[in-house]
């Protein structure tokens, strides 16, 4: 792998809040050594996009890895000089004086293999053919992502993270870290996540994938060669997903049964505000996301089940962990309900592992983990204060 320089944020040419990490620049890490995948195949000569915030201390003990969810990326915080509107997806959590304080911690965001934001994925050129991988890109798993992230840590000379943190799918990666590399993280922070998908969640993913696969513009996953994108399928997939990210309470408050116009029109066009919102979200998503990536990531979600190798016994699976845990859930999250977080907490307690648990009564459903709720952020701030005290940050 090429040498890694620890980047510093570029000077801002525009006004930013004092608690912003500022203008940031991603870096591309190239790995020549093949990465063995869980499916038995391997991928060589791959790239991972990485962003960092804060300063790695001399002991390299203050690093925190932030793992991203389905449609996010390495761009966790800050803005890009070429597009100051492109704010990091967890910017309210990461920055100077924020819960994950970059004055004390060195924060790393990694874009996972198979994504469409610069890391090697279906849109990348397959060296064997000179054309985009497309449908030929190998199916990847949460464990594969974690193994690749461990190589990023090696490149920075980080032998142990102060914490590995993630929400939703990112939380699954944090759990996988605690199992695959138990000695390489002091703390595991799991937010709005689950130890495995329920049958209902797998079903949602299947319906979303079916929308993409049945789009005439999908072309078996090789739509790049045809100069098209399966936008209709991707739009429907996003609409389905977005419904599951919001609570009934939140949707009622935002939209209720408000009409888009003054009166009903007795048509099958958009009549209600909630329909307009979902179509807008679907159209926006279809413009920037890749359909093959959506298929890969939702399948990785489906496959994650650390208890499977232990006959379905999560307590036995979690016996491998050494980290201290913070697990947080949200009362109105029906995608990954609090009961799923409590399963994880029980398995940890059964193993006498140190774990703190909080269930936050927020009205915003699954997406609450991305929002600036004072109770949620105070919880995270207090926990990171504890970590900082432990490591002398």
From Swiss-Prot:
NCBIfam families: homoserO_Ac_trn (TIGR01392), PRK00175.1 (NF001209)
Enzyme superclass (EC): transferase
Source organism superkingdom: Bacteria
Phylogenetic lineage: Bacteria, Pseudomonadati, Pseudomonadota, Betaproteobacteria, Burkholderiales
Signal peptide region: none
Cell inner membrane is among the record's keywords: no
One Gene Ontology CC term in the entry: cytoplasm
Residues that bind substrate: 238, 367
Reactions catalysed according to its record: L-homoserine + succinyl-CoA = O-succinyl-L-homoserine + CoA
Recorded name of the encoding gene: metXS
Organism expressing this protein natively: Cupriavidus necator (strain ATCC 17699 / DSM 428 / KCTC 22496 / NCIMB 10442 / H16 / Stanier 337) (Ralstonia eutropha)
Annotated keywords: Acyltransferase, Amino-acid biosynthesis, Cytoplasm, Methionine biosynthesis, Transferase
Record: active site: 168 (nucleophile), 333, 366
Protein's name in the database: Homoserine O-succinyltransferase
Domain AB hydrolase-1 residue range list: 62-372
